[in-house]
Amino acid sequence: MQPNIQWLDTPAVFRVGQLPAHSDHRYYATLAEMAQQQSSFEQSLNGTWQFHYSVNAASRPKSFYELAFDAQDFEPITVPQHIELAGYEQLHYINTMYPWEGHYYRRPAFSTSDDKQHLGMFSEADYNPVGSYLHHFDLTPALRNQRVIIRFEGVEQAMYVWLNGQFIGYAEDSFTPSEFDLTPYLKETDNCLAVEVHKRSSAAFIEDQDFFRFFGIFRDVKLLAKPRTHLEDLWVIPEYDVVQQTGQVKLRLQFSGDENRVHLRIRDQHQIILTADLTSGAQVNDLYKMPELVQAWSNQTPNLYTLELEVVDQAGETIEISQQPFGFRKIEIKDKVMLLNGKRLVINGVNRHEWHPETGRTITAEDEAWDIACMQRNHINAVRTSHYPDRLSFYNGCDQAGIYMMAETNLESHGSWQKMGAVEPSWNVPGSYDEWEAATLDRARTNFETFKNHVSILFWSLGNESYAGSVLEKMNAYYKQQDPTRLVHYEGVFRAPEYKATISDVESRMYATPAEIKAYLDNAPQKPFILCEYMHDMGNSLGGMQSYIDLLSQYDMYQGGFIWDFIDQALLVTDPVTGQRELRYGGDFDDRPSDYEFSGDGLVFATRDEKPAMQEVRYYYGEHK
């Protein structure tokens, strides 16, 4: 297939040549590698690449992927990094409106009577910046003579990929991994990878989150070798009997390549407690009963077990060994109250954007570790990944720390239904448009398939502030069908109550007052109540928190919420007059339209210094640990 620039304009094309989403488990060549958490099957492509910036698609170097192309005009750029923070593009923060409002008239594809009005909307726009990346690499010895895929863990917003002059594929969905098979065109040395990233595409209508509007390759890029027998996908489904405190594990495994033996081991924190042997068929579905009482997982006791699957050949040599931590816990609704392991669940939560004051949404494992430690010392027991999937490593950290997760799908179309504060959903997407269904469901599928093994995830969230419609009904049904062990969350049906019966297991609101919450709970409530956003911490805020905390003792069906939000979105810049480093917020970069200091709602400053408001959080959340 040949690439088409008009893929940018239509929601019908969102993945081309992309491999199916799968579990995020890691795998190793030896037991020693697994012990060190260093896999020889992985090769990082992070580092210095070559780069060219174009203001639109028409002016981009169209043949830059060809091996004979002269890239002398390209400049060095660090990957991962936002293109804006490399100095090529204006910084821009906005909350609700689409970033082009006031500059261009645009409506989502298929939302008007003109079913062709979207053609050229982004592909022919006079302003839709393009980043053209080139990177030359040699394969490490361990990756040679094997199947090799490339994983982009985060690219905003639409990308085309070539290797050695051959088109590989196309991907949207900025915040989940995109993988492509490079094997047919790969060489041992002097490979030329070309990636073309477009700032906006039809996906911009459903990635309208409250944040700085960056683009580029902003998360890790790596190569992954697949040995001759490979575990493609792994789903550990622990089942926990709360009364008996016993457990069993369902395993759904998908292998590729040669059929070989597999040694299965389950470890607790001290020793191996279960072993079994199986064969690496294409599909494996097995059930294993734990031999003794199990230790449940919760915020207070984040007990983890570890599954190991070692593939061995006929000579007994290890081909591959995979590892997946998991835990036993049960989340359910009984008598309209959410229970975790048989006890009422109280959410002392916070919404969290990924952020660093110098690198934006390009963050590190150290940043994540600081955030989790900060939550723990301030009695924050839950996090909502607002409003997109986070880096893979953050989910592991929450598993280990006992932080409850609301795992949000990358979906927000705020500007399509709320205009200048008024609810006006006449061209809301995805809404009930068939043409938007596949792209939207693909985002749910990728979110689920990638993170399904993480015990910390109690809720799948359909997204944020996208109103409602039949497409979200189908998202809800997808999550419920795939994973009945978790709850599904969505707030937007509050504004479209005709969908309340078919979307969301919980009554979720934003910024409802204590009086409004009481009114719901005093009038035949049908679902447990949570606040997916509350206590908007902008400026010197967070007063009145006790009014919400008191409700926890008054109503069993009121089960807490997620403060907005954890960290300011602000950037450290050098003032040209004083030479001092200072934090700048939305609107400080001559970015228009903008919502200005609305980017600064965190309990901690962008520099990760706690604000005084955090004292309130520590005190009140500490009452209901």
Swiss-Prot record:
Summary of the function given for this chain in its UniProt record: Component of a beta-galactosidase.
Source organism per UniProt: Latilactobacillus sakei (Lactobacillus sakei)
Coiled-coil segments: none
E.C. code: 3.2.1.23
Catalytic activity: Hydrolysis of terminal non-reducing beta-D-galactose residues in beta-D-galactosides
Subunit annotation: Heterodimer of a large (LacL) and a small subunit (LacM).
Family: Belongs to the glycosyl hydrolase 2 family.
Pfam families listed in its UniProt record: Glyco_hydro_2, Glyco_hydro_2_C, Glyco_hydro_2_N
GO BP, sorted A to Z: lactose catabolic process
Protein name according to UniProt: Beta-galactosidase large subunit
Enzyme class of the recorded protein, top EC level: hydrolase
Xref: InterPro entries: Bact_Beta-galactosidase, Beta-gal/glucu_dom_sf, Galactose-bd-like_sf, Glyco_hydro_2, Glyco_hydro_2_AS, Glyco_hydro_2_cat, Glyco_hydro_2_CS, Glyco_hydro_2_Ig-like
One GO CC term on file: beta-galactosidase complex
Cross-referenced PROSITE patterns: GLYCOSYL_HYDROL_F2_1 (PS00719), GLYCOSYL_HYDROL_F2_2 (PS00608)
PANTHER family xref list: BETA-GALACTOSIDASE
Assigned keywords, A-Z: Glycosidase, Hydrolase
Active site: E465, E533
Molecular-function annotations in GO: beta-galactosidase activity
